[in-house]
């Protein structure tokens, strides 16, 4: 009888979201990241270096929310859009603190 490895957390997806989650979980947990291809092969690279984030005073959360909802053609969940964009600066700052170069 074969045995399977045991993990506390299984993360499905190895793009920026999945790998960010893995980095933020406590080191005491046994974590597995499941990817359909090599690690880092998620859709994040499709952004080609671009990222929608409110980083300057001349920009606004409301402008990004409006743009995202318009581009989403009715498919976006507005509370999720507002939550994500409202925290975009924090997310970029965290990525930079982890060594991400933009």
For the regions a language model picked out, list residue spans one by one.
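A short, basic/flexible loop-to-alpha-helix module at the beginning of a structural domain
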Residues: 1-6
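N-terminal Rossmann-like FAD-binding beta1-loop-alpha1 element of flavoenzymes
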Residues: 7-33
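Conserved N-terminal/central alpha/beta ligand/cofactor-binding core
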Residues: 36-102
